[in-house]
Amino acid sequence: MKLLDKFLFAVFILFFLLEGCVPSKPTEEAEILSSERLINKLEANRRKIKNFEGVGTFDIQSEQFNDGATFQVIMQKPDSIYFSVLGPFGIELAQALVTKDNYIFYDILHNTAYRGNLNDDILQNIFKIDLSFSDLLDAFVGSVNLTSNLYKEPSNYSIEGENYVLTYLDKERQLTWVYRVGIRELGITNFTLKSQNNQINIEGDYSNFELIDNVAFPFKIEVMNKVKNQKITINYKNISINDKRLRVNFELPDDANIIEW
């Protein structure tokens, strides 16, 4: 099951990459935005990406394993992702199709498929942290889904160096979200999720931004789950977006062994 655990850990991080990507501006055109304008820009541009395809490598470091692989990911809004793990010479080792509600993971070498429903209990068993599915996805990738915040101010808003800093407090759950957004490229550069006593549960760093169809994407992503002492590093080699021809065709072989998990 280690391969399945690696897949789940990686795919949750990749799932909403397109959520955190926003158009970039040249340095000379950058302007200082009010929190209201920044939030509106981030949310409006978040919705522009309809699909996403990327190829790259990921490396996972944890107490249980240290390993990496080459992968391909295809995401279709609003909530589906196809993920393929590649071995030497580009040979496929595993495939998966995931939605917000369900997942199916196919171990090609053993001709075995695992499938089931996604829920917060599964996430908590994997990540040992009490967060909802959407909160965990946002935390890993640094997306700013500000739909619920369009008409209210952040708990704190400031400028530090070349970054806007957006802070959101949830007093009921005793959680604090802090997003750092580059003033020039308007991309998420850092994200932290803190629990009570200001302890960091999850932290993400995003760098090596490149402009694709007037959208800035981080080609390097580092996410630390400090609760479980895990770290994943993602380096993209190629990214394409909004390809109308992009389709996912994933079917299990008739003789595959299927396990409900």
Q: Could you describe each region identified by the protein language model?
A:
Residues 152-261:
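Gly/Pro-enriched, hydrophobic low-complexity segments
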Residues 1-21:
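Sec-dependent bacterial lipoprotein signal peptides
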Residues 123-163:
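Hydrophobic, well-structured mid-protein blocks that either form specific transmembrane helices
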Residues 80-134:
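An acidic-aromatic
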Residues 44-52, 64-67, 74-76, 96, ...:
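Edge/loop elements at the starts and ends of beta-strands within beta-rich repeat scaffolds
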Residues 21-67, 259-261:
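N-terminal leader/targeting segments and the immediate start of mature chains
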Residues 63-66, 86-93, 197-200, 226-231:
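Solvent-exposed loop/turn segments connecting transmembrane beta-strands
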